[in-house]
Curated annotation (Swiss-Prot):
GO molecular function: rRNA binding; structural constituent of ribosome
InterPro entries: Ribosomal_uS8, Ribosomal_uS8_CS, Ribosomal_uS8_sf
Annotated GO biological process: translation
Phylogenetic classification of the source organism: Bacteria, Pseudomonadati, Planctomycetota, Planctomycetia, Pirellulales
Function of the molecule: One of the primary rRNA binding proteins, it binds directly to 16S rRNA central domain where it helps coordinate assembly of the platform of the 30S subunit.
Protein name, per record: Small ribosomal subunit protein uS8
Keyword terms: Ribonucleoprotein, Ribosomal protein, RNA-binding, rRNA-binding
Length: 133
C-alpha cells in the first residue's frame, strides 16, 4: 500500500528527468491531474494526457517532460513539502517567491491545486504540496 501518492509522483518525475526520458507515466488521481496542470501552466512540462488501459482499473497520466534546446533540464529540483506525517499550511501572505521567482510552490486550496503565484494574486492560502525549480 502506498502511503504518499504525491511523493510517488514527484519521485517518478525526478527519476525520469535524471535519465532524460521524454515522458513519464503516473497512476491518475484528481490531485495529480491538478499538479500536472500547474506544471504545464508554469512551463515545467510540455503537456499531459490521461490514458486508460482496458485491463487496469485506474487510468494513467502521461506527462511529456520538457528539456532545453541543448538537452538541459527544465525541472532542476522537485521536492515534497507537506507530508502525511507533517502537514504544512500557509497563508497567501506567507508564500514568498521560490528562487527569486524562478521556481514555484504548488498549493492545494479550496479553489483547487494552484501555483503560489496564483495563490498570492487571489489571496488564497492552503496546503503547500511541493516546490519545483
Amino acid at each position: 500500500m502506498m502511503t504518499d501518492p504525491i511523493a510517488d509522483m514527484l519521485t517518478r518525475i525526478r527519476n525520469a528527468v535524471r535519465v532524460e526520458r521524454p515522458f513519464v507515466d503516473i497512476p491518475a488521481s484528481r490531485v495529480k491531474r491538478g499538479l500536472a496542470d500547474v506544471l504545464k501552466r508554469e512551463g515545467f512540462i510540455w503537456d499531459w494526457k490521461e490514458e486508460k488501459l482496458e485491463e487496469e482499473p485506474v487510468g494513467y497520466l502521461r506527462l511529456e517532460l520538457k528539456y532545453g534546446p541543448n538537452g538541459e533540464r527544465v525541472i532542476q529540483s522537485i521536492r515534497r513539502i507537506s507530508k502525511p506525517g507533517r502537514r504544512l499550511y500557509s497563508r497567501s501572505k506567507e508564500l514568498k517567491p521560490v528562487l527569486g521567482g524562478l521556481g514555484i510552490r504548488i498549493i492545494s486550496t479550496s479553489k483547487g491545486v494552484i501555483s503560489d503565484r496564483e495563490a498570492r494574486r487571489d489571496k488564497i492560502g492552503g496546503e503547500v504540496l511541493c516546490e519545483v525549480s
